Amino acid sequence: MTVRQLTTTDGTYTVSGEGFKPKGKLSYEGVEVTDAKMEQLQSDLSFRLSAACMSLCHNSQISKVDSRWQAIGDPTDSACAVLGWKINGDVRKFAQRHSRIHEFFFDTTRKRMSVIHEYEGERWVFSKGGAGGFLPITDWKILDGEIVPIEPEDIEKASIANKEMASQAMRVLAL
């Protein structure tokens, strides 16, 4: 399993790479994201938190053994961790810099996994799971670096993106 797309409030990024090898690039509208552009994206709170969620909200171990990358853990978690690695670098080192305080394991009632981490001097809850598990609890969004109330059209836009990706036989997760 490999992450192929990352859709944020700013648009959809395609992701290159194979399997659990944490090598690959993001592209936006067909143009590869350069290191300079990635630095700019990392200054955007929404993108940065999405990338942090990929790097922190999992229990997988990604490692290179005998020149081959492999993952120990849930394949979905592992695919997310690999995307986190492509954006933030080694997820093990990233997690060491942002200590985990608590975990709420995935369960079929909540339909999501959540973790609390120290991140950028504050405690943040990072969650990932099926989009339906987020709808009842989604009240806020990040717009231009500010946390603002979510609007009905935002939910509709996310629902359309979800259906579009699902129609391409993609497993869709919400962050």
Task: For the regions a language model picked out, list residue spans one by one.
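Conserved cytosolic headpiece of P-type ATPases
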Residues: M1-L175
